[in-house]
């Protein structure tokens, strides 16, 4: 019997329009009513993970920023975190700047950017919960504003090195965006081979950088240990590279139908795509 289901958000729990469909919502709530814990394990901001978890009444600790932080499901506050080290970030900045790539850093619900631009301008609002069922634009705008305010933007200026040396709080993740394929792959390889970082591809033009050893799997392992849940009692669903270790570790690794081939190959089972309520289908096929 499974005691925990861990769900990635984008490409998994959310459909292509970034919506929790009624079927997915109902299936998750049925699973929770059957006394199976359900959590989110995502690369997104803690506030975004928390907001989506509240939509389906999750009450198990949540995983955000690729496993760098765990989040209280009731309050949205930090439970535990693994931050990037200052000296490691300075090395990272040297490497990134040599290639002329874009980078920004994640605090706990704070996005630190050199300047607000077209790359990052909508980053906070894109983390909101999409609610197409709301009757009026006014209702949607009001909730969008509330949720966007949960994530702060801080412009630090051109000198990221000075900011990192004097940073006011912990930084848990960096996002690197580079449109040139060769430069991007060189950056990924250099940072990964340094042994200082865990790098994961999260899009066609970008990758995320966490401290070495940080992963969704690692965060779930710690949570399971604290709640006396065995690995064999865990199911996990995902679609992308930052889900690989989680799917391989879980007792039941579920790849989405929209996942790339290498993700499907390491999973135990493949469900329908996120456009076809694949999470709901997996819940009813394997967990209920």
Residue spans for each PLM region:
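Conserved acidic, metal-coordinating active-site core of Asp-based
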Residues: 99-101, 106-234
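Active-site phosphate-binding/coordination module
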Residues: 22-139
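Mg2+-dependent phosphoryl-transfer enzymes with acidic/Ser/Thr/Gly-rich catalytic loops
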Residues: 1-4, 15, 21, 192, ...
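Short, well-ordered alpha-helical microsegments
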Residues: 46-50, 183-185, 217, 243-244
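Asp-based phosphoryl-transfer active-site loop
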Residues: 3-16, 92
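Short active-site oxyanion
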Residues: 35-39, 59-60, 172-173, 232-233, ...
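Conserved beta-strand scaffold positions in the cores of enzyme catalytic domains, especially
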Residues: 62, 78, 155-157, 199, ...
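Hydrophobic packing residues within well-ordered alpha-helices of enzyme cores
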Residues: 24, 49-53, 187, 263, ...
